Amino acid sequence: MKYLTRLLSKFWLFLNYEKNDFYLGGPMRNYPDLNAPLFSSVSHMLRIKGFKVWNPSEHGSYLDTSFAKCMTDDLTAIIRDCRKIALLPGWQKSLGANMEAFVAFACGKEAVEVVMSENGASCELIPFDLSKYLLPYDGVNTSKFNPHEE
């Protein structure tokens, strides 16, 4: 009976599982407090608008975890737990955020860029076509890769 109760409980959780609307992707390393104030501010603004948000700065301690472990957790969240990716200001210059954007694209997720108001009190979500983005970190040359094209 105990086994059946646990099984039914897991099945109920599976049926009622709701994905996050957005995963927040943006620069963290080499920022004071790992850029947590920006991540927190944007996640708060989006939650007020009724969105469900996966904010990586709220999951685990980035100060005590390796880059590889952080990326494993974050990419898993993008693949499994989120419908779209919201790219924060400065994401283009972040290796981690570029990987997150690429994985989101490879998995067919939609993307938006977060544009902050001048005073930082509000943000706008601008649709962003990841298929038009050229992959960085190849010196002078960039490469274009679209896994969804034949």
What spans do the regions from the language model cover?
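Conserved catalytic or regulatory cores that recognize and/or transform ribose-phosphate-containing ligands
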Residues: 2-150
